[in-house]
């Protein structure tokens, strides 16, 4: 199997809401088959009847267009403490929330759900004993979600390494250390990472920790999905792969594919994670610039466009 290209729906949140509008735009205008669906489109906290209706609507749109939801991820309004929250009842809420999310994604044909491993407060992260206690609690929370997700037909759950210690996975060494611990937890289905090659602690003494290519060489065997965007030296945003950004960006197809291959990539999903400001003219450039980004990668990574029905 070959690498496949997908899109995280972050930049489509609020700009689209109805399943038909979202999915038809992806097929017709972006010419891309695979989506990582963020939770805002079918929010697990909504009423069950609303979730069921919108999930049915989205599934019909997927069947009609050939678009696929491959996974579910928390979106721009879901970067929260979750299983790192100090309050037990709040953590309980999010365990149930992610179980519902797993059901939604499973019903849409996706194979995984995830978010950050946990986000700790200053207070909890800075206390070594409390930090370790809360890490164990977070792993237990994920194990419960994984057990439910297995029943929903998912293949794995995932965590996203970030760029600071209290969000976890901030260096390659810390990232692999936590991954080893999660693998050893032997959950009902595996918990893999979903690495973003543009993340990493820019204050690290090891330059590999903020080198996208070093991450690309390291993570493929433990990161079925890998986020990419056009990386600038200032780490200034989730830039699209447009001609203007490509001219000054670090990420180019040939060296990136070489790095992935060196890391053992075989059938990984390479997921575009982009964002656009709610300002003019950016707000109306979203679809054209994502389409340009997809077209930029199309000669190198399978977009699945041949499977689209519109």
From Swiss-Prot:
It comes from the Bacteria. One of its GO terms (molecular function) is isomerase activity. The keyword Iron-sulfur does not apply. Induction: Induced by erythritol and repressed by EryD. Gene3D superfamilies: Divalent-metal-dependent TIM barrel enzymes (3.20.20.150). Pfam families: AP_endonuc_2. It catalyses: D-erythrulose 1-phosphate = L-erythrulose 1-phosphate. Catalyzes the racemization of D-erythrulose 1-phosphate to L-erythrulose 1-phosphate. This is D-erythrulose 1-phosphate 3-epimerase. It comes from Brucella abortus (strain 2308).
């Amino acid at each position: 199997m070959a690498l496949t290209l997908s899109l995280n729906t972050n930049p489509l949140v609020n700009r689209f809401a109805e399943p038909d509008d979202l999915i038809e735009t992806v097929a017709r205008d972006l010419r891309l088959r695979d989506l990582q669906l963020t939770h805002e489109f079918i929010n697990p906290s909504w009423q069950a009847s609303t979730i069921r209706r919108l999930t049915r609507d989205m599934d019909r749109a997927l069947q009609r267009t050939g678009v696929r939801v491959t996974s579910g991820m928390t979106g721009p309004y879901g970067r929260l403490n979750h299983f790192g929250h100090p309050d037990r009842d709040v953590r309980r809420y999010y365990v149930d929330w992610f179980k519902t999310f797993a059901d939604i994604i499973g019903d849409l044909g996706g194979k995984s759900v995830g978010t950050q491993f946990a986000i700790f407060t200053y207070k909890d992260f800075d206390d070594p004993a409390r930090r370790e206690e809360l890490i164990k609690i977070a792993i237990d929370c994920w194990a419960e979600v994984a057990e439910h997700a297995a029943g929903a037909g998912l293949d794995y759950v995932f965590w996203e390494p970030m760029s600071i210690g209290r969000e976890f996975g901030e260096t390659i060494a810390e990232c692999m250390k936590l991954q080893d611990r999660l693998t050893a937890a032997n959950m009902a289905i595996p918990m893999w990472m979903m690495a973003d090659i543009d993340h990493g602690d820019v204050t690290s003494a090891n330059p590999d920790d903020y080198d996208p290519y070093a991450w690309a060489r390291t993570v493929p065997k433990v990161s079925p999905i890998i986020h990419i965007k056009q990386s600038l030296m200032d780490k200034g945003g989730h830039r699209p792969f447009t001609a203007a950004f490509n001219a000054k960006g670090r990420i180019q197809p040939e060296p990136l594919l070489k790095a992935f291959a060196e890391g053992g990539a075989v059938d990984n999903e390479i997921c575009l994670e982009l964002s656009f400001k709610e300002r003019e003219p950016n707000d109306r450039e979203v679809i054209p610039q994502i389409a340009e980004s997809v077209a930029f990668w199309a000669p190198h990574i399978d977009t699945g466009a041949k499977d689209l029905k519109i």
